[in-house]
């Protein structure tokens, strides 16, 4: 019997402690110490405790949840959701027969965001308590293969001896050379989530996921937003080219401005005015942009500073990541790493999966993850989501594929919701019909992509999904119709 997600805990505990008795002494203070209380770390800590390990989580910040819950996924979604409601009230309600006057109360919107964050971070604390996970607030440094020291705010140091150490320290904002972030006028994603007033003009460096989401928030609230992107498309790496073009067109209609194939040369500040110097990446054409808020969103980098990796001779790769094997194990057998500090997309759900799998592996179970089945979502309006390969990747790999598409304008639920922009696109192997990638732009794309992810995880064909009964009327029918088009060349409800 192997340890899996369906294994009963008594067996898991029994097998785990048999492994410990064979390989370790019993003098340590913990079975596992987790460095970092973000999505990967806190989930791993809880899972480890559920498997019977005495677990301690060390987090440097006062609240648990990491970047995602405190200054990332959660607060940004709160602002995206509420700014969308305001935009609908001002620009969409009248067409629905709703007459009203809506205005922005920014302090109240920020308070609602903060309340969401507070409830969720507090919830993790309760989960730790319920699962008997130890929590130490302090900065963790690895001083040996089985020892972590946590320096607390009062200057005291707590030493934790552990059979295993799991690094889940996350990532930090990548700085832009020559531009100093003050989180007031020149801001990172952190500052952009807490601006005290709506900018008149905002320039966003980077038209990836973070830049587009936060730019959308402030554009809806009244700012004139221009995104400067070095690449020739919006949406970052991995997005399907056709989807990206439609995405840019949609955001442009909303008032978003874009300068693509353009690099930022520098920025200077004079009082409340920021001057941004840009240059065409292809033609070398120079121009200047003026704004009162500059958002730097050029990505994130692994956070490993001060972890003490050199104390255990762990070297980083050329991108600052911790090298691990297929069991998330470093070159030191007792030290593991997951999430943003290792290779792969910097996504909270990817870190969560790795955390669960890693501790199951420590307990003697199997470890497997298919990174081709890790979905990505951009929570703008319309939403954009994808999983698997894009057309460009399949062409580059020389894979013969077929396409099935279905527009939301032909979907009954999208019609009744008066939210019918976008489409579902399915890429399937031309010979076997196996789904290779799914790309959605449109309403609730982030929710719909879960079905596609499940189908791909189980190796489904387009025909498999096309033959599954979907409830009517729902947006999910568009996914079925796209698979029908991929499988037999034609959807039912589209000419």
UniProtKB/Swiss-Prot annotation:
GO molecular function, one term: dihydrolipoyl dehydrogenase (NADH) activity
EC number of this enzyme: 1.8.1.4
Domain of life assignment: Eukaryota
GO biological processes: 2-oxoglutarate metabolic process; fatty acid biosynthetic process; pyruvate metabolic process
Catalytic reactions on record: N(6)-[(R)-dihydrolipoyl]-L-lysyl-[protein] + NAD(+) = N(6)-[(R)-lipoyl]-L-lysyl-[protein] + NADH + H(+)
Pfam families on file: Pyr_redox_2, Pyr_redox_dim
PROSITE patterns in the cross-refs: PYRIDINE_REDOX_1
Binding site for FAD: 59-68, 77, 169-171, 340, 346-349
Principal subcellular localization: mitochondrion
Entry's family note: Belongs to the class-I pyridine nucleotide-disulfide oxidoreductase family.
Protein's name in the database: Dihydrolipoyl dehydrogenase, mitochondrial
Organism from which the protein derives: Caenorhabditis elegans
Gene, per the UniProt record: dld-1
């Amino acid at each position: 019997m192997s340890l899996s997600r369906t294994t009963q805990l008594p067996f898991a505990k029994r097998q785990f402690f048999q492994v410990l008795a064979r390989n370790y002494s019993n003098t340590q203070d913990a079975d596992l110490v987790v460095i970092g209380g973000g999505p990967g770390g806190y989930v791993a800590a809880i899972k480890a405790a559920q498997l019977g390990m005495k677990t301690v989580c060390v987090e440097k910040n006062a609240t648990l949840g990491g970047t995602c819950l405190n200054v990332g996924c959660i607060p940004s979604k709160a602002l995206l959701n509420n700014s969308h409601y305001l935009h609908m009230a001002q620009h969409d309600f009248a067409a629905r027969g709703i007459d009203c006057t809506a205005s922005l109360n920014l302090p109240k919107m920020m308070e609602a965001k903060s309340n969401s964050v507070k409830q969720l971070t507090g919830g993790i604390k309760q989960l730790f308590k319920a699962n008997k996970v130890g929590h130490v607030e302090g900065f963790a440094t690895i001083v040996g293969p089985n020892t972590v020291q946590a320096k607390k705010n009062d200057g005291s140091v707590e030493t934790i001896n552990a059979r295993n150490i799991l690094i889940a320290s996350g990532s930090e904002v990548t700085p832009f050379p020559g531009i100093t972030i003050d989180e007031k006028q020149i801001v990172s994603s952190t500052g952009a989530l807490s601006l005290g007033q709506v900018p008149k003009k905002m320039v966003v460096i980077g038209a990836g996921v973070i830049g587009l989401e936060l730019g959308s928030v402030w554009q809806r609230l009244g700012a004139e937003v221009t995104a400067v992107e070095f690449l020739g498309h919006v949406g970052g790496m991995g997005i399907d080219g056709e989807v990206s073009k439609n995405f840019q067109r949609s955001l442009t209609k909303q008032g978003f401005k874009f300068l693509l194939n353009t690099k930022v040369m520098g920025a200077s500040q004079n009082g409340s005015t920021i001057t941004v110097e840009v240059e065409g990446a292809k033609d070398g054409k120079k121009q200047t942009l003026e704004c009162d808020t500059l958002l730097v969103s050029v990505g994130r980098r692994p956070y490993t500073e001060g972890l003490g990796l050199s104390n255990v001779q762990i070297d980083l790769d050329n991108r600052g990541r911790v090298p691990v094997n297929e069991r998330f194990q470093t070159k030191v057998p007792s030290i593991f790493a997951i999430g943003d500090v290792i290779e792969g997309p910097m996504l909270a759900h990817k870190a969560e999966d790795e955390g669960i799998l890693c501790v199951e592996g420590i307990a003697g179970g199997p470890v497997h993850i298919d990174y081709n089945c890790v979905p990505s979502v951009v929570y703008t309006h319309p939403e954009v989501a994808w999983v698997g390969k894009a057309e460009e990747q399949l062409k580059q790999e020389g894979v013969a594929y077929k396409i099935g598409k279905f527009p939301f304008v032909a979907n009954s639920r999208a019609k009744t919701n008066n939210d019918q922009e976008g489409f579902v696109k399915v890429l399937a192997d031309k010979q076997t019909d196996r789904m290779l990638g799914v790309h959605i732009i449109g309403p609730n794309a982030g929710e719909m992509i879960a079905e596609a992810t499940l189908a791909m995880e189980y190796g489904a064909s387009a025909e498999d999904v096309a033959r599954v009964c979907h409830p009517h009327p729902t947006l999910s029918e568009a996914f079925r119709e796209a698979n029908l088009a991929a499988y037999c060349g034609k959807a039912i409800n589209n000419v």
